[in-house]
């Protein structure tokens, strides 16, 4: 089990590596953005290599259209959940942090990261590594992976009450995504639903 935790830790550290470019001191924003792009491709490549080497996920195969349509229905469910939450409680602290990142990165680079790169790295770490690799798609793995997924998206909330309702929101979204992974046993479908959900959030749909 130690080896599995080690691999999961490697994937987690890699997934956060690109963002570190923007906390470096004495480096211009232009160079930080260039370094960020380089780190994105570096991180994607090595995260996938590690995942395949240790059987965290299966190799990627061509998508099946019936399963893609299945994913679209769950994307709609995710957006409905988010809209209900926002209409009741307003934006989360995670939304505010994402806006800060967007201002630093620029809209185009931020959207590329949020829509295409972030979902891949998060799915490999939380659902590929934790739910599947560490806990073999068990109920325990399902619960742990989605609580951690929720925690990572709301650890900066200003009060315990807001934190609790935010972690419930993001954990529920994680559950919807991981249910797709559980049913299909293919990480590309959970990545797809995650990408589509982030795309709709990016265009404020």
Language-model features: where?
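Non-cytosolic membrane-interface motifs at loop->transmembrane helix junctions
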Residues: 29-36, 95-102, 161-172
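Transmembrane helix-loop-helix hairpins at the membrane interface
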Residues: 107-205
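Alpha-helical transmembrane segments in multi-pass membrane proteins
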Residues: 4-51
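Residue-level signature of transmembrane alpha-helical entry/exit and packing/kink sites
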Residues: 7-11, 32-37, 63, 67-71, ...
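Juxtamembrane "helix-exit" motif on the non-cytosolic side of transmembrane helices
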Residues: 19-28, 82-92, 154-158
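Juxtamembrane helix-loop-helix connectors linking adjacent transmembrane helices
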Residues: 53-118, 161
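Alpha-helical transmembrane segments of multipass membrane proteins
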Residues: 14-22, 39-43, 74-82, 122, ...
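Membrane-interface helix-boundary motifs at transmembrane edges
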Residues: 26-29, 54-65, 129-137, 181-185
């Amino acid at each position: 089990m130690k080896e599995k935790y080690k691999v999961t830790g490697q994937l987690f550290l890699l997934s956060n590596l690109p963002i570190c470019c923007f906390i470096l001191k004495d480096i211009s924003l232009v160079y930080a953005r260039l370094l960020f792009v380089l780190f994105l491709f570096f991180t994607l490549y090595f995260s996938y290599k590690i995942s395949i080497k240790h059987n965290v996920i299966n190799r990627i195969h061509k998508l099946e259209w019936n399963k893609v349509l299945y994913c679209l229905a769950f994307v709609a469910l995710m957006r409905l959940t988010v809209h209900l939450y926002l209409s009741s409680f307003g934006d989360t602290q995670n939304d505010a942090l994402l806006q800060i990142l967007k201002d630093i990165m620029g809209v185009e680079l931020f959207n590329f990261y949020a829509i295409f790169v972030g979902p891949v790295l998060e799915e490999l770490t939380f659902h590929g590594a934790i739910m599947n690799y560490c806990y073999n798609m068990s109920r325990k793995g399902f619960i742990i992976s989605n609580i951690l997924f929720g925690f990572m998206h709301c650890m900066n909330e200003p009060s315990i009450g807001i934190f609790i309702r935010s972690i419930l929101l993001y954990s529920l979204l994680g559950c919807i995504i991981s249910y797709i992974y559980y049913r299909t046993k293919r990480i590309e479908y959970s990545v797809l639903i995650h990408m589509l959900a982030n795309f709709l959030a990016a265009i404020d749909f």
